[in-house]
């Protein structure tokens, strides 16, 4: 009788474990140039300056069945900003704005993911930028997941937010340039 009870318990535990889906860990695919952090800011209220950060890295965990358990962490080297104009890049990197010599890194670490639709979520986390940490929420869209041609698995997302520069101790260059829009595209390779 004890053997039958133990066998039933073992089978039940195995079946329950098999039914549980665990969040998978992904490395953001920077090497393959399948991930970007782009930004834009108003120029005098007449047009927009667009740019990107070239040096950054990150990871995320993703569970399609339980998106609220997902997490993301990103580290950006602020000196890697690029706006297709070398003199402007130097000025943005200077003490006048980002002061990249003093604040070499910007970091985002998620604290909560709230599903807002079938393929959308609000991703809230702590953004550390210019030596200040503040909560920020990104509007994220799940693009898809599946196998790649090289035998791996991938998942992809887009996320957008607007950041007020004054919140991070950065004085914008004018009244129309107090906010910066961030547009992030992430494709991650599932880790084994």
From Swiss-Prot:
PANTHER family linked: PROTEIN YCEI
Homology family: Belongs to the UPF0312 family. Type 1 subfamily.
GO cellular component: periplasmic space
Keywords: Periplasm, Signal
Subcellular location: Periplasm
Gene3D superfamilies documented for this protein: Lipid/polyisoprenoid-binding, YceI-like (2.40.128.110)
Superkingdom per UniProt: Bacteria
Protein name (record): UPF0312 protein PFLU_5725
Keyword flag Signal: yes
Signal peptide: 1-23
Keyword Coiled coil: no
Main location: periplasm
């Amino acid at each position: 009788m004890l053997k039958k009870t133990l066998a039933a318990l073992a089978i039940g535990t195995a079946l329950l474990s098999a039914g549980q889906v665990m969040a998978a860990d992904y490395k953001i695919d920077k090497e393959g140039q399948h991930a970007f952090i782009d930004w834009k800011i108003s120029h005098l209220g007449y047009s927009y300056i667009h740019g990107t950060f070239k040096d950054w890295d990150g990871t995320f965990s993703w569970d399609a069945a339980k998106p609220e358990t997902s997490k993301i962490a990103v580290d950006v080297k602020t000196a890697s900003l690029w706006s297709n104009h070398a003199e402007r890049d130097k000025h943005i990197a200077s003490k006048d704005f980002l002061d990249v010599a003093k604040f070499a890194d910007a970091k985002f670490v998620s604290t909560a993911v709230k599903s807002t639709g079938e393929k959308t979520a609000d991703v809230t986390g702590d953004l550390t930028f210019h030596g200040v940490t503040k909560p920020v929420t990104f509007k994220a869209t799940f693009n898809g997941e599946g196998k790649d041609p090289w035998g791996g698995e991938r998942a992809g997302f887009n996320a957008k937010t607007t950041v007020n520069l004054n919140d991070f101790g950065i004085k914008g260059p004018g009244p129309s340039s107090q906010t910066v829009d961030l547009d992030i595209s992430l494709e991650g390779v599932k880790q084994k």
